[in-house]
Amino acid sequence: QVKKQLESLPVLKPIEAESQDEKFLSNIIRLIEDHLSESELNVNALCELSGISNKQIYRKIKQLTGMSPVEYIKSTGMKKAAMLLQQKKFTVAEVMYMVGFSNHSYFSKCFQAEFGKTPRQYLNDEL
């Protein structure tokens, strides 16, 4: 009789602290941040580092963030660049290399697209 009662109880799944999507995204963010200074960081490198296929990375990042993986990597780099510039410890050129860019004009263009001002203007506004 006890056995029947136990069998009739609903099976409770352990409560997960994070959803699978949150785990996926936090893992991707960690990988991007860990390898941001590498100018070779791209979607293929991210696939290699994470062990996840290109198609799956694209689909999941697009679904969770609304951005393509390329846009997401670039956006993460720009946010990190803004944070580094706010610290006032580094020059624009140093920050550019720290977030994986080697072309100053392209870095400036991407930064301006993200924040509406050049890195130099951003730095001057923060002073």
What does each of the following model-derived ranges do?
Residues 63-102, 124-127:
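Terminal helix-turn-helix DNA-binding modules in bacterial transcription factors
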Residues 44-52, 57, 61, 95-102, ...:
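Append "Primarily bacterial transcriptional regulators
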Residues 52, 67, 117:
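Short glycine/serine/threonine/alanine-rich loop segments
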